[in-house]
Curated annotation (Swiss-Prot):
Entry keyword annotation includes Transferase: yes
Coiled coil feature spans: none
Main location: cytoplasm
Protein known as: DNA-directed RNA polymerase subunit Rpo12
Cofactor: Zn(2+)
Enzyme Commission number(s): 2.7.7.6
Function recorded in the entry: DNA-dependent RNA polymerase (RNAP) catalyzes the transcription of DNA into RNA using the four ribonucleoside triphosphates as substrates.
InterPro entries for this protein: RNAP_P/RPABC4, RPABC4/Spt4, Rpo12
Originating organism: Sulfurisphaera tokodaii (strain DSM 16993 / JCM 10545 / NBRC 100140 / 7) (Sulfolobus tokodaii)
Class of enzymatic activity (EC top level): transferase
Length: 48
């Protein structure tokens, strides 16, 4: 399941809630700009 964040109210929701409305809009405020939240990953870099 992908997580999304609204560009206006900054609430997070999943793709099931996104499919509930026609088009791509925030289910809470109806804003059209939505960001996909990335999982926090740690990048390990070998020291030289």
């Amino acid at each position: 399941m992908a997580k999304y964040r609204c560009g206006n109210c900054w609430r997070e929701f999943d793709d099931e809630q996104l499919r509930a409305l026609p088009g791509v809009r925030c289910p809470y405020c109806g804003y059209k700009i939505i960001y996909m939240v990335r999982k926090p990953t740690v990048k390990v870099v070998k020291a030289i």
